[in-house]
């Protein structure tokens, strides 16, 4: 089974399926066309436009007014990656690094970043073959994108840095040679496209969200079993109670409890006590608030992982290259 990277909305549930089932990925034909079209547009634009383009024909940050000679553009992008690969601290877990690769590929696939198709395809190769760059947890604020962790993630594209492959930490150039992969020669804009972005924080966010959803499911299961064992009442879980308050998660929790306890002889039998303790009666309100929070976080993260987040942003159809702040 193969998941095709495309403009189709990528859900957190689909991300979970890809990771848990070790599903391979590939670029859809439409994604390939968008990537190639954007790169060709950028190359043509650089031949005809005399005005400087930030980070493409200029330096970075405070050096934005310094023009870069054409024969130095590739070296500029390579230098950018190497200079920012300064992460420290504990290593990022392998499953998070793999998720970072997936999200970076998705972000680059929209055709607004100006990268070479070859560059994105190599990231796909890394993902599919579990060639996972060594990335560190500290070194970046995220205020200008996840610069340091993404730089460490992208070093192996150049044959630099280290990767984890088959359980061993190895120099990336050795592993590239085993696969017959040549180091990528970055073209103008590519270093920025790879480093600018939110895939490090998004990967941790998505991973945490997947865990939170699972914990929420378990909380309902444990709560239902506890209510049944306590010989509790199902009355606090009827729809009428929760429809008048209209919090979605609260109603969802109540219905889930009734579903889980359907057919239970204990829950259906007459009760001697008038009401249950707070800890049982308020489960829909407490679990429901958690569900609503998880849903909100999910909506934010899904918007983020379905967006290009580098800078400058390229719009080939409108003949626009704009320096903005979607990396923040």
Model regions: which residues?
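Alpha/propeptide regions of enzymes that mature by internal proteolysis
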Residues: 91, 114-115, 217, 299-300, ...
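FAD-binding glycine-rich core of flavoenzymes that anchor FAD
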Residues: 112-138
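Hydrophobic alpha-helical scaffolding
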Residues: 5, 28-31, 66, 86, ...
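Mobile "lid/hinge" segments at catalytic clefts and subdomain interfaces of large enzymes
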Residues: 149-257, 262
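N- or domain-start disorder-to-order transition segments that initiate the globular core
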Residues: 1-50
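Accessory "access/gating" subregions that flank catalytic or transport cores
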Residues: 227-328
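FAD-binding core of FAD-dependent oxidoreductases
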Residues: 54-68, 72-76, 83-108, 136-158, ...
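Short alpha-helical scaffolding segments that buttress acidic/His motifs in well-ordered protein cores
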Residues: 15, 80, 84, 96, ...
């Amino acid at each position: 089974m193969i998941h095709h990277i495309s403009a189709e909305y990528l859900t957190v549930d689909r991300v979970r399926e890809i990771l848990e089932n070790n599903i391979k990925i590939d670029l859809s034909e439409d994604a390939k066309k968008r990537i190639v079209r954007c790169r060709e547009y950028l190359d043509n634009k650089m031949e005809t436009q005399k005005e400087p383009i930030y980070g493409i024909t200029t330096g970075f940050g405070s050096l934005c007014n310094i023009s870069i000679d054409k024969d130095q553009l590739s070296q500029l992008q390579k230098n950018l990656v190497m200079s920012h690969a300064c992460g420290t601290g504990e290593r990022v877990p392998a499953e998070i690094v793999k998720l970072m690769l997936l999200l970076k590929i998705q972000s680059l696939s929209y055709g607004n970043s100006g990268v070479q198709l070859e560059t994105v395809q190599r990231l796909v190769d890394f993902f599919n073959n579990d060639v996972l760059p060594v990335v560190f947890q500290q070194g970046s604020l995220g205020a200008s994108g996840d610069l340091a962790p993404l730089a460490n993630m992208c070093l192996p594209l150049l044959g630099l840095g280290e990767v984890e492959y088959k359980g061993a930490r190895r120099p990336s150039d050795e592993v590239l040679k085993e696969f017959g992969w040549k180091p990528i020669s970055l073209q103008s804009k590519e270093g920025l496209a790879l480093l600018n972005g939110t895939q490090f924080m998004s990967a941790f966010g998505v991973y945490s969200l997947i865990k939170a959803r699972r914990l929420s499911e378990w909380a309902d299961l444990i709560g239902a079993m506890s209510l049944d064992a306590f010989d509790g009442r199902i009355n606090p879980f009827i729809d009428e109670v929760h429809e008048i308050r209209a919090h979605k998660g609260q109603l969802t929790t109540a219905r889930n409890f009734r579903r889980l306890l359907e057919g239970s002889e204990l829950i259906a039998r007459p009760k001697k006590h008038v009401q249950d303790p707070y800890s049982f009666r308020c489960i829909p309100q407490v679990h429901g608030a958690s569900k609503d929070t998880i849903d909100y976080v999910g909506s934010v993260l899904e918007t983020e992982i379905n967006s290009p987040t580098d800078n400058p942003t390229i719009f080939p159809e409108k003949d626009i290259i704009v320096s903005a702040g979607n990396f923040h």
